[in-house]
């Protein structure tokens, strides 16, 4: 599965993406805001991530900025199943691309995919000390559930408090919405 937005190409990662992936995410300021990413992050970690099995339905994408030349890797995003069975939206953006709206743009594409898949809702979380991610989730329409729970963070070497967010998606099927429009 692939997705395009006005500025981005979202596509699965391939083995040849490992060096660029390791370079883009190899920043403690990024990894300290992700729960399961190892630190320090190496090319070997990128190779293992890219070779790991993926959910056959829920997408996992690398995010590329569309340019006049070859697309430039700026992050990753995806939908994943939590142990509770809920579907979680996750993302990260390389530091050089912070503040350009890429997380919001990629998140909107994932929400469209979730609606197409007929998912009733999405969950997301952000560490309490990451207000930038809170702003992205707010822009995407997620609402705070009132729950703050500890989540493990490999870069921090400990659990840190994370706010649980939820987005309820349209109850109608995508085809019904298109017909009604």
Predicted segment positions?
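Flexible, nucleotide-binding loop/lid elements of kinase catalytic cores
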Residues: 1, 37, 59-61
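Conserved GNAT-fold acetyl-CoA-binding loop/helix
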Residues: 29-51
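Acyl-donor (CoA/ACP) binding surface of acyl/acetyltransferases
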Residues: 1-29, 63-181
